[in-house]
Amino acid sequence: QKQPIGKTFIKEFSDEDGTTIKIGFVSVCIPSNPKDFVVYDDMYEKISSSYESIKDHVDVVFGLTHATLENDIRIAKLLPNIPLIMGGHEHAHSNNLVGNVQIYKADANAKTVYIHKITYDKHTGKTSVSSELKEINSSIKTDKKVGSIVKKWQTILVAQIKNVIKYPDEVIFEAKTPLD
């Protein structure tokens, strides 16, 4: 069932000694697949107003985007106090630093995931992000709930590809020289 979600999201975490941190999330999406149940506005105005509405109620704000790298770079310049933008759209992983903003994008279709280890100093307000790109493969035990979601979307992906290419796994060329 489709339910409206807020323009921002706040999640509170605590460590072993009870120290808490409030993390705010702001998000935008490009209108690449418009749906009648999704509202698309100017992403720069929306993410700026979302940031302004949440920044004084949390310790740190992160961005979640489905936008082009060019869009994410512009957002990073617009909101230089967001230490991390977790993005998507290009389908190939990337890691970019714009000022003090780290922009990470994993590969599409659950091929990879970035694992972000975040440290926040409550006294200085400094956030440190250490990120690792991890390939999703058989060495990782599948979470049943996540695995069923991935399987559903992989099935949809294969069906959609077969609408365009009858035999998508067919070898059509064998290079004698390795290609980069």
Placement of each model-derived feature along the sequence:
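A short C-terminal boundary segment appended to hydrolase-like catalytic domains
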Residues: 120-180
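Acidic, metal/ion-coordinating pockets
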Residues: 1-141
